[in-house]
């Protein structure tokens, strides 16, 4: 809708995790280096955490698209699985077919991993949104981490999730799994206005923008403040701001448009937020209740009953 108006070939701020639009902050670069190192060197279990919207899934998809063909990846993005469902997913994704019981599956999986490892091939199991895994499934993941040769792990495991994943792994019942974590990575939000400006410019250029000053400097500053530096929040603000700017016929997105959008999505900095209707009504309700109580007491003291 607004793409042609702003000279864009496609929408630059879609919320889908399109690897083409990935922007590497120093934090993203560090996480990618750790993931690459963990997989290449056969470290075993890698844990990646980050706030909602910081780009965990985008990084995973970008990495999977660029892994060597010798790497077989099993990617599980639904953590709400029972143990049988989890193993069904693993067996399907890793092409292990002849099994009926868990012990048979583990035996066949071990043979398949050993065969691949002996031929110089690597196998990676990635579980996204892992903070939602049950303790029972996490214990099974610990068992899968036992597949190893004398020199390296035969199955690389990557768990990604929100910061709550760290709390889940601190469960005393999962201490054996926690002890097997070889690498921990944290994806951080964009740290400042300058990085936010580079992020916005990068996405505009990927979308075919002919000009990079669509967002005025003061609007970028306010976007950073409203978004807390989280890419998904930035995308949401920018996408809706471009739509509002198009509707208003504004070639440049100023701060006022960002303020309106942020207010609509309840993303204004706390100091600028208007109280909700309930909050605005609360003092009046308190006063009204107090007044009724005072009037009732006054009537009781004077003997009025009407």
Which functions belong to the PLM regions below?
Residues 120, 193, 227-239, 251-254:
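The conserved phosphate-sensing helix
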Residues 3, 9-13, 253-306:
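Trafficking entry modules
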Residues 62-66, 165-180:
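Short regulatory helix/loop adjacent to the ATP-binding pocket of P-loop NTPases
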Residues 189-216:
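Conserved small helical "lid"/interfacial subdomain of P-loop NTPases
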Residues 10-13, 71-72, 81-100:
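Conserved NTP-binding/hydrolysis module of P-loop NTPases
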Residues 82-85, 98-140, 149-152, 194-196, ...:
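Mid-core helix/loop region of P-loop NTP-binding domains shared across ATPases and GTPases
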Residues 76-80, 168-172, 182-195:
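Conserved AAA+ ATPase "SRH/arginine-finger" region at the nucleotide-binding site
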Residues 41-63:
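Walker A/P-loop nucleotide-binding motif
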């Amino acid at each position: 809708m607004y793409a042609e108006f702003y000279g864009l070939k496609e929408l630059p701020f879609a919320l889908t995790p399109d690897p083409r639009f990935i922007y590497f902050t120093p934090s993203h670069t560090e996480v990618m280096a750790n993931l690459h190192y963990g997989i290449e060197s056969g470290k075993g279990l890698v844990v990646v955490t980050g706030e909602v919207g910081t780009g965990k899934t985008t990084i995973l998809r970008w990495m999977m698209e660029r892994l060597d063909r010798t790497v077989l990846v099993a990617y599980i993005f639904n953590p709400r699985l029972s143990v049988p469902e989890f193993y069904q997913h693993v067996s399907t994704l890793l092409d292990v077919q002849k099994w009926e019981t868990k012990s048979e599956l583990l035996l066949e999986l071990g043979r398949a991993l050993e065969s691949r490892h002996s031929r110089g091939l690597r196998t990676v199991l990635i579980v996204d949104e892992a903070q939602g895994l049950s303790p029972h499934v996490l214990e099974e993941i610990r068992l899968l981490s036992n597949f190893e040769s004398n020199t390296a792990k035969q199955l690389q495991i990557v768990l990604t999730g929100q910061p709550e994943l760290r709390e889940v792994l601190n469960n005393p019942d999962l201490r054996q799994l926690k002890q097997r974590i070889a690498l921990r990575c944290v994806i951080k939000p964009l740290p400042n206005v300058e990085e936010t400006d580079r992020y916005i410019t990068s996405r505009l250029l990927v979308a075919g923008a002919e000009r990079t000053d669509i967002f005025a400097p003061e609007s970028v500053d306010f976007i950073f403040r409203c978004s807390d530096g989280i890419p998904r929040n930035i995308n949401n603000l920018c996408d809706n701001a471009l739509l509002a700017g198009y509707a208003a016929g504004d070639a440049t997105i100023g701060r006022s448009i960002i303020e309106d959008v942020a207010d609509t999505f309840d993303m204004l900095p706390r100091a600028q937020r208007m109280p909700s209707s309930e909050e605005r009504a609360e003092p009046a309700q308190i006063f009204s209740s107090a007044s009724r109580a005072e009037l009732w007491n006054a009537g009781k003291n004077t003997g009025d009953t009407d």
